[in-house]
Regions:
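N-terminal Rossmann-like dinucleotide-binding module
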Residues: 1-60
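Acidic-histidine catalytic/liganding microenvironments
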Residues: 35, 75, 141
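Short, well-ordered coil/turn segments that N-cap beta-strands
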Residues: 38, 63, 103, 130-131
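Short, Asp-centered acidic motifs that coordinate Mg2+ and/or phosphate
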Residues: 42, 80, 161
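Beta-loop-alpha module in the N-terminal Rossmann-like domain of NAD(P)-dependent dehydrogenases
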Residues: 61-124
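A contiguous active-site-proximal alpha/beta segment in oxidoreductase catalytic domains
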Residues: 112-174, 182-184
Length: 190
């Protein structure tokens, strides 16, 4: 696949229906809908067809469903695959399949369940020449962009300590670290 294909809309496919409970409910399946020059064509999700999936397809604009990711990649021949699951242990297999086919990736965070898997994913992207983006939208929030500008300009001095905080309630702990921690750490190094 080459980056110079601009004569047609970019084809985007979705891996996993994130409208399912415990799959994120982040709306990542709708991230590309309505963007100019983009066509969302299909969702691959192994679960049974449900009203929830039908709604996710309607929201995303996808018109086809596949039970298997590799079949979807081969049939749809997408430019970009969106890995929608927030479960990092589900990312590596579809990323391997996409990289083998030269499909660019937009992946829900956290990228991987282990450092070894993250290194493998980075190596796959580099070796195949694909672009890999991890979903960290908080860095584009106006408040954080202004904070970054103030820090970089020296207007508020040099930060000495940065403290990250999650929900600070019963939902905290390891789950909070996985769900919010990557955003907090991303903002700290942004």
């Amino acid at each position: 696949m080459t980056a110079a294909r601009h004569d047609r809309p970019r084809r985007v496919v979705l891996v996993f229906d994130t409208s399912r409970p415990m799959y994120g409910l982040h709306g990542l399946h709708a991230a590309f809908r309505g963007l100019p020059g983009v066509e969302v064509t299909a969702i691959a999700d192994p679960g049974e067809a449900t009203a929830r999936r039908a709604a996710a397809m309607e929201i995303s604009g996808a018109t086809r469903h596949y039970a298997e990711v590799e079949t979807m990649f081969d049939q749809e021949r997408p430019d970009i695959a969106v890995i929608c699951s927030r479960h990092p242990d589900e990312h590596l297999a579809p990323i391997r399949a996409a990289a083998a086919r030269g499909i660019h990736l937009f992946c829900e965070k956290p990228l991987a369940a282990t450092a070894a898997a993250a290194r493998e994913i980075a190596a796959l992207a580099a070796a195949s020449g694909i672009k890999l983006a991890v979903v960290h939208p908080a860095r584009f929030d106006a408040a954080f962009l202004e904070m970054k500008r103030l820090v970089e300009s020296g207007a508020i001095g040099r930060p000495l300590t940065v403290i990250g905080r999650g929900k600070c309630d019963a939902r905290g702990g390891g789950e909070d670290l996985i769900v919010l921690g990557t955003h907090i750490l991303d903002l700290m190094v942004f």
